[in-house]
Amino acid sequence: MGSAQMKSVIVTGGGSGIGLAMSRHFASEGHNVAIFDVNAESGAKIASELSSKHPNATVTFRKSDVSSWDDLAAAFKEVYEQRGSIDIVMANAGVSEQGSSSAVDLSEAEPTKPRLKVFDVNLTGVVYTVKLASHYMNRKPKTANSRGLIICTASNAGLYPFPVAPLYATSKFGVIGLVRSLAAPLAQHGIQINGLAPAVIETNIAPSKDLFKDMVITPMETLIRGVAQFVADPSLSGEIAEIHGSEVTLRPPHEYADADTKKNIDVFNSLGYA
């Protein structure tokens, strides 16, 4: 799925941070880009700016909350009806835990309910996005290469322990598990799914720029190279690209502990249920 042909692209969380970089990238290549974001004011402004800067592209904005099935489903349907196809979907919208994690607080006299918005957006929102993307991609005629590509934004916090934000880390571990587990069933329909696991990239997801002052920052350009690699090569699916420094490293899944474990997983797969 190269860039020579204009594609219909959706970017969730496409109005800021990593999503904005993705929106800019696809607009610069002359694609039809639909930006989904909860911030209506900035999203509409960005769509207008990108349209002016890249007249060969079509850039639109729709206010959309990925944690709402009804809202997101309506947004996907609108794009499909307007364009007739959906080729690339960036399941990118995400939030951080913001402050101390509510997963465990041993200072409380009485336990309070954990704040789970990070799951609603980062994991449930990605599940919703993937389901809708695959539904509309599957309506396309099957070609030799691809019916469509889904790229999910995870994090290297989904690869390593991240004690300061355990719920955020859990949501990103979940995204990685979703990508790896859906690759085979989606491949049967000519759809690819991959994930990005970026290291520290300076974005507005952080509560303050002070957070980054002592960090090693990964350039946004490295992440965009990872995106371009997945777009260019439809043979890649179920892959997680760790984005770190100037490197894009495809991280393989864990090896099976033993032959029995592999056999059991293979049996589950052959049965088609668990």
Where are these regions (language model features)?
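Canonical Rossmann dinucleotide-binding motif of NAD(H)/NADP(H)-dependent dehydrogenases/reductases
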Residues: 2-34
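Active-site-adjacent segment of SDR/Rossmann-fold oxidoreductases
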Residues: 29, 160, 169, 181-191, ...
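The beta1-alpha1 cofactor-binding region of Rossmann-like NAD(H)/NADP(H)-dependent oxidoreductases
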Residues: 40-41, 63-75
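Amphipathic alpha-helical dimer-interface segment in Rossmann-like NAD(P)H-dependent oxidoreductases
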Residues: 77, 81, 120-144, 183-184
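Catalytic Tyr-X3-Lys loop
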Residues: 95, 107-130, 151, 175
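Conserved mid-core segment of classical short-chain dehydrogenase/reductases
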Residues: 96-116, 141-145, 164-167
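Residue(s) in the substrate-gating loop at a strand-loop-helix junction
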Residues: 155
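C-terminal helical subdomain
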Residues: 195, 211-259, 270
